[in-house]
A protein has these predicted regions:
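Alpha-helix capping/helix-boundary segments
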Residues: 28-29, 67, 84, 101-102
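Residue-level detector of anion-binding/catalytic polar loops
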Residues: 21, 59, 94
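Phosphate/NTP-binding elements of NTP-utilizing enzymes
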Residues: 32
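Acidic catalytic patch
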Residues: 49-74
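Short, well-structured N-terminal submotif of metal-dependent ribonuclease cores
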Residues: 1-24, 37-51, 105, 111-113
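Acidic, PIN/NYN-like endoribonuclease modules and their adjacent C-terminal/linker elements
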Residues: 55, 85-113
Length: 113
């Protein structure tokens, strides 16, 4: 993928080769819609959603009661970040993020640069 640091780019390439999974919390999709509506990113909803429906290597993770319970133990400022981190923690997943607060928190293992 273009414009990503090497480690993040490599993670996406592993997924493309079928060597790994990427979990996508539903809040991330909601954020994408919001940012597109505000004109901050370019996004084709139909293409994104259809690709996610057929891609076995991208797993959409719903907001569940377990995630909400885990949010209580995530001391970050932004609710959406807390949801994302709580989801990663419950899944035991490495979080691909450039968010400095999340990376500095060491709540979950992160990957970016």
């Amino acid at each position: 993928m273009d414009m990503l640091p090497a480690k993040a780019d490599n993670a996406f390439r592993q997924v493309e080769r079928g060597e790994a999974l990427i979990y996508v919390p539903t809040i991330v999709l909601a954020e994408c819609v919001y940012l597109a509506e505000k004109g901050r990113i370019s996004l084709r909803y139909d293409e994104l959603f259809s690709r996610l429906r057929v891609a076995g290597n991208f797993v959409v993770v719903p907001l569940t009661l377990e995630v909400v319970e885990e949010i209580i133990r995530v001391p970050l400022r932004e609710l959406h970040d807390r949801i994302i981190v709580a989801t990663a923690r419950l899944l035991g997943a490495i979080l691909i993020t450039k968010d400095e607060e999340i990376r500095a928190s060491s709540i979950v293992e992160t990957l970016w640069e």
